[in-house]
Structures are given as C-alpha cells and as structure tokens.
Amino acid sequence: VGSEMCIRDSFTDMQSLCTESGYEMFNRLIKYGQGKIISEPEFRFLECNGEVTCRSLPMSFKFSNQRTFVEDVVFTLNKESKIDCLSFGLNKPAVDDIMNQTSWNDTVRNVLINFLESYKTAYALKRYDYINSIFSDDALIITGSVLKHTAANEGQAMSKQAVKYTRQTKSEYMKKLQHIFRSSEFINLRFADNQVRKSGVGGEIYGIQIKQDYFSSSYGDTGYLFLMVDLNNPKEPVIHVRTWQPEKDPDFGLIDLSHF
C-alpha cells in the first residue's frame, strides 16, 4: 500500500509539472509496456523560441512476449517551464541528417526533428486524436503491407506481388488505424536514412523521405515512408501526402516532393 501511495503521489506531483497535453503524453508513456530507466542520463538542453528541449532519458520498455524496445525519451518545456511534450528521440544519424542542412536556420531544423519525433511517438503511444489532427482532410494516403508468402529458395528476393498497396481517404485510414491500435499490444517505429527537401512554393512545406522499421505485436515490415508536410505553423503541422513503398523502385526511385 505504501508503494502504491508513493507512486500515486509522484504522479500527482508530475501533473503539476506538465501542461494538459504533456500530462496526457506522460500517462500514455507510463502505460507503454514495463518501462525503466536503464542508465544514468546525460541530459542535453537546447533553447529555441523560448522553449527548451531536454535530451535524453534512456529507457527500455518490455512487453508480454519479452519484446523490448530501447528509447531515448525527449522532453520539451514551454515558456512557463512546464513539460509540454514527451517523445521518443530520433537516432543520432537521423538527427545529423537534418542538422547538417546548414542552409536552414536552427528553428527550421528543430521544427523538423520535433515533428518526426512527435509523429513516431504518436503511433507508439496510440495518440489517435493527435494523428487525426495532423492529417489534412483531403490528404493523399497510400499504405502498403507485406503479404505472408513462402519463398521458393532461401534468400530469394520478394516479388512485387507480395506487397499490397491501398489508397485511402483520411477517414478510411483513421478507421483502420483505430482498429490497429485496439488490437495491438504494442507499436514501435524506427526511422533512419532520412532525406528532407523544401518545396519551392507554399512557404515552410517539406518533403520527408525516411526509412521506417515498423514493429507491432501482430505485424512488422521495413519500407520507405514519404510525408509532405506543411510546417508554416510548427504547433499545428499538416500532412498532405503520406505514402509507403517497400523498397526503392529501380526505374523511379523513391516517391518524393517532385511527384506532387
């Protein structure tokens, strides 16, 4: 009973340190498997436009099938020094890909990193309302899934017929996502090899190509995600295009900003 009271008290204390959205994310985080801090954190702080980003708290999250994910948890504090966002950080190569874009200012680079971290974390923590809010009502959405198959020989390349593509409206995509959230014990996304290009029109509109490893309790795949996102208002990103393909097409390469 004493330990339960201690935990409950600590959660109460945590609420006073967070904004409403920050506390909602915290509650989802502590329900994400069995979480624990795995090493002494070496925090790094970055101030941008009055907000402070704190990286990174190393944590592991274990699920019932012994599947474990290791994440660097990132905190964003608002101008009142309250935790406004919790996210799973990008790995160092992915961050470096964006930070090395020296033609962009620090604000742009930080907005892009924060967006990608919020995006991947929203799927892991099943933040349905947030995901619904960032997709444009008329977004172009193409999903893909790798079908189960038996290769004739070990190591044989997968045929194109083994991948199913589906074009969906936003409402169709969100309905399917809701089912996935309800039926999956866990979801985890890993990003790598990202390329970001700025559109020549529309202000802060970016095309993001990124390699995605998708893990869930019932399905997994690796492929290439493309997002065309409007970041003119960094607090309210709008995704206009979301596509997925399992590998680079030998004739056309990856879907990118030039296709739209």
Where are these regions (language model features)?
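Sec-exported extracytoplasmic/periplasmic mature domains
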Residues: 16-19, 120-124, 136, 140, ...
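Loop/turn elements at helix/coil->beta-strand transitions in domains of secreted/extracellular proteins
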Residues: 126-129, 187, 235-237
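Short beta-strand edge/turn micro-motifs at domain boundaries
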Residues: 63-108, 201-209, 213-260
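Extracytoplasmic/secreted proteins, especially bacterial periplasmic and envelope-associated proteins
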Residues: 13, 21-28, 107, 111-114, ...
